[in-house]
Amino acid sequence: MGLPEINIAFQSKAETAIKRSANGIVALILRDATKGDITSYSYTNESEVVKSHWTTANYDYISKTFLGGPQRVIVERIGAEDTYDDALARLKNKKWNYLAIPSLADNEKDIADWIIAQRSAKKTFKAVLPYAANNEGIINFATNDIKVGTKVYTTAEYCCRIAGLLAGLPMTEGATYQTLAEVESITESTTPDDDIDGGKFILINDGEKVKVGRGVNSLVTLSGDKTEDMKKIKIIDSLDLIRDDIKASFEENYINVVNSHENKMLFIGAINQYFKSLQSQGVLYDGADCKAYIDVESQREWLAQKYDVSGMTDSEIEVANTGSIIFAGADITIQDCI
């Protein structure tokens, strides 16, 4: 506990960031009445899945998810007539990265809205859905008739495979041109460039193999802090991991520490060391000045609600007492892939 541990915690997180980013967790919601006494499952590999606990189709969805190499697959079971609300309530306080629901047919918007609401509440959940949500937290998978062996999958059914693929990628790799070796054929887009520009995650066939066209999410409309690079899954995944790391280190090592200016600067310094380590590993762009800082402007606005700060300099604002609140900001540039 305490400040001496902050640098150690951040350094540890930076050193393991790439490995941890390739160990993402997929959450599945499956309709299945085979074994109704258990509603939640957690598997670290396919061999742990008991076939008799699931229908043939659902066992296949779990297997397809593991093809991408996620660290873990969480499965929430619901009955044939149940809504998704109970499963989402169980998932709300669990740790995971990507959600997929193979049976999804009419509730795409509801699920997308739930994900967007969770992200607004500082969760880093994302979902692969057959739905154009115009949001960086939703991957709009838009390829149909995916033939694997004797089975042809719908778009919704194969979202689990895409979720597993994305969860298994490290921050140093993008999804673009990742091969799905098991796929024999698809219904190919006649306008792939337009689809990608429209926020669709599609598969393409180059004549030899089926692969991801480009690793984009469903974000299309740019405004404010929604910039062009936020259309890319790799960028959002990296931002999410960095956000989670900083939040976790703050909660583990800084809560209940005296909120003096000196301690604020120690915490900011620890974040900056973390950023430097990520730059050296190629996660953050090494040509950018990636840094955290006291957000003087936000701090001034907060103080102005309590007393007149019009005559105070930025330096005076920076060292002013802010109670239990830290006003911190950061400017970083994620390293993109070619």
Residue ranges and their predicted role:
Residues 1-136:
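Small-residue-rich
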Residues 83-252, 256, 283, 290-297:
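A glycine- and small-residue-enriched flexible loop/hinge signal that marks low-structured segments
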